[in-house]
């Protein structure tokens, strides 16, 4: 049998190492822990990268997918570190990175009618392994925000809009996505729901009006809650208000390493 040439293993004379190289945006089924139903199946977008020494021309792209296929029945949070270790071993790398983004669904009940519906939240698992394993959980929570300035100035109501609060965490003890969402969505003027009847719409509108928030208020309130959570060691929080009376958005961000304070 003729030996196939391995172009990736050939030498590169430019002497430039690459920090991250690999495959991006793979659509793949995964299983996520669900607080109420134990497990939830969803479909993720996955990125897999390793470093590449300066003397190699390229990495072996097919091996990333082979590793993913080897874990096809068991791609979950507790497999992040083993997958990263396998990436390092199979690709001869000193560092590996795995990014998993997926929709996660939580059943919510409307605030007055109690009507049930599913809300979608975009979540991320970001893991890396060099000498040590590092993991960051990310969740994006939609809320309603109502402008305090508009309320103060206007005789008839105030402008309001949907907002996104994005939190990323490092932690020492397991945190349920459901608990994180419930904690963070209280920092907006009002939570949002997929299904609202008329009595619910009245409640949400009036609640937001009585609870106006600037984007600055939102990130500060989230920060207070995350600082008070004993399991969280590092976090970043971003808030973006999709302004209903402007072409642009309003934005604020805070990052804290609790080990440094």
Curated annotation (Swiss-Prot):
Q: Is Hydrolase one of the keywords UniProt gives this record? A: yes
Q: Which of UniProt's keywords are assigned here?
A: Hydrolase
Keyword Transmembrane assigned = no
Which pathway does this polypeptide act in? Cofactor biosynthesis; 7,8-dihydroneopterin triphosphate biosynthesis; 7,8-dihydroneopterin triphosphate from GTP: step 1/1
> According to the UniProt entry, what is the EC number of this protein?
3.5.4.16
Q: What does this protein do?
A: Converts GTP to 7,8-dihydroneopterin triphosphate.
**Its catalytic activity?**
GTP + H2O = 7,8-dihydroneopterin 3'-triphosphate + formate + H(+)
Instruction: Name a single GO biological process.
Output: tetrahydrofolate biosynthetic process
Q: Which EC class heads this enzyme's classification?
A: hydrolase
Residue numbers marked as site, May be catalytically important: 147
Instruction: Name the family.
Output: Belongs to the GTP cyclohydrolase IV family.
Stored PANTHER family: GTP CYCLOHYDROLASE MPTA (PTHR36445:SF1)
Q: What is this protein called?
A: GTP cyclohydrolase FolE2
Q: Signal sequence span per UniProt?
A: none
Q: Which InterPro entries does the record associate with it?
A: GTP_cyclohydrolase_FolE2 (IPR022838), GTP_cyclohydrolase_FolE2/MptA (IPR003801)
Task: List residues traversing the bilayer.
Answer: none
Q: Which organism is it from?
A: Geobacter metallireducens (strain ATCC 53774 / DSM 7210 / GS-15)
- What taxonomic classification does the UniProt entry list for its organism? Bacteria, Pseudomonadati, Thermodesulfobacteriota, Desulfuromonadia, Geobacterales
Example GO molecular function: GTP cyclohydrolase I activity
